[in-house]
């Protein structure tokens, strides 16, 4: 059995999957915020309960926001303070007497989608998250590409390309990102960015769902706004696709529920790609909230 943990600032979620990649059991507990020992106990108790329930010693994978293992072997995860700065993988492997694998939550999202029955035919899968921020992951032959610093797939911190500035207007403000850089695409393409663009052009504070509702009603300003956003997304994604050249792009996050993104994006991409490039298949994520657990569990499938 494959045990997948999706760990965040408020909850530890465990999903148990069988060899057919089907969810058999899940359970959630609150994430301890202050005590590392309590954090380890919470994970180990869930593993022990799963082992007893299924009569086996399942493999353990964990998805967590942040850098799973820094150069000194410790975790960096600002949203999980009880475990940040601690050698989480080594400590859990020792306590559970098995190989525990960690990766960041965005890679686990991408891995979950790459192992979908419909998508396993594609060697190179790119996950793109358009949510509170912009991120994602790359999966090659069923295995995450992590890189030295676990920042592969941090697409949101690429800068706006020159033709995006031409498209949006020369007086378009370059916003400072939370990472400290200026002009990161996450500030324009995330759900927050979608709402910020509306306020910038129309001087009216609305949230993304409200703007999308106006678009669905045929509001002219909302139609123009969505058209502008999709063009901006296409030019930024075109840069990424020129580097990565995936077979499939799977889009997750809150904005993935807006069908215009997956239905219209492919038609806008060719003019932002090399003439010989083929537009990849673009799909909405299939597994929703379960994706984090699925992807973490499947960190052991690539063996």
From Swiss-Prot:
Catalytic reactions on record: N-acetyl-D-glucosamine + ATP = N-acetyl-D-glucosamine 6-phosphate + ADP + H(+)
Superkingdom of source: Bacteria
Pathway(s) per entry: Cell wall biogenesis; peptidoglycan recycling
Entry EC number(s): 2.7.1.59
rRNA processing as UniProt keyword: no
Keywords associated with the record: ATP-binding, Carbohydrate metabolism, Kinase, Metal-binding, Nucleotide-binding, Transferase, Zinc
GO molecular function, one term: ATP binding
Residues involved in Zn(2+) binding: 157, 177, 179, 184
GO biological process: N-acetylglucosamine metabolic process; peptidoglycan turnover
Binding-site positions, ATP: 4-11, 133-140
Pfam families: ROK (PF00480)
The keyword Nucleotide-binding appears for this protein: yes
Protein's job: Catalyzes the phosphorylation of N-acetyl-D-glucosamine (GlcNAc) derived from cell-wall degradation, yielding GlcNAc-6-P.
Protein family: Belongs to the ROK (NagC/XylR) family. NagK subfamily.
Protein name as annotated: N-acetyl-D-glucosamine kinase
UniProt source species: Escherichia fergusonii (strain ATCC 35469 / DSM 13698 / CCUG 18766 / IAM 14443 / JCM 21226 / LMG 7866 / NBRC 102419 / NCTC 12128 / CDC 0568-73)
Lineage summary: Bacteria, Pseudomonadati, Pseudomonadota, Gammaproteobacteria, Enterobacterales
């Amino acid at each position: 059995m494959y045990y997948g943990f999706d760990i965040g600032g408020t909850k530890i979620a465990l999903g148990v999957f069988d060899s057919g990649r089907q969810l058999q059991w899940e359970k959630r507990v609150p994430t301890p915020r202050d005590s590392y020992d309590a954090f380890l106990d919470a994970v180990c108790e869930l593993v022990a309960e799963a082992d007893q329930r299924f009569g086996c010693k399942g493999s353990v994978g964990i998805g967590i926001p942040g850098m799973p293992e820094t150069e000194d072997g410790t975790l960096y995860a600002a949203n999980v303070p009880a475990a940040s700065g601690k050698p989480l993988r080594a400590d859990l492997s020792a306590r559970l007497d098995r190989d525990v694998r960690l990766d960041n939550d965005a890679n686990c999202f991408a891995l979950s989608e790459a192992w979908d029955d419909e998508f396993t035919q594609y060697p190179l899968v790119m996950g793109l998250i358009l949510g509170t921020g912009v991120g994602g992951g790359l999966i090659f032959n069923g295995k995450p590409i992590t890189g030295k610093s676990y920042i592969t797939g941090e697409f949101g911190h690429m800068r706006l390309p020159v033709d995006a500035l031409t498209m949006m207007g020369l007086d378009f403000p370059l916003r400072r990102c939370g990472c400290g850089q200026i002009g990161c695409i996450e500030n324009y393409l995330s759900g927050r960015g979608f709402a910020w663009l509306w306020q910038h052009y129309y001087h009216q504070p609305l949230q993304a769902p409200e703007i999308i509702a106006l678009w669905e009603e045929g509001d002219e300003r909302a139609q123009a706004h969505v058209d502008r956003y999709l063009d901006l997304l296409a030019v930024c994604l075109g840069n990424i696709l020129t580097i990565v050249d995936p077979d499939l792009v799977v889009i997750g996050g809150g904005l993935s529920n807006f069908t215009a993104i997956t239905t219209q994006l492919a038609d806008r991409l060719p003019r932002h790609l090399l003439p010989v490039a083929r537009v990849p298949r673009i799909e909405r994520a299939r597994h929703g909230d379960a994706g984090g657990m699925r992807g973490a569990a499947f960190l052991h499938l690539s063996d």
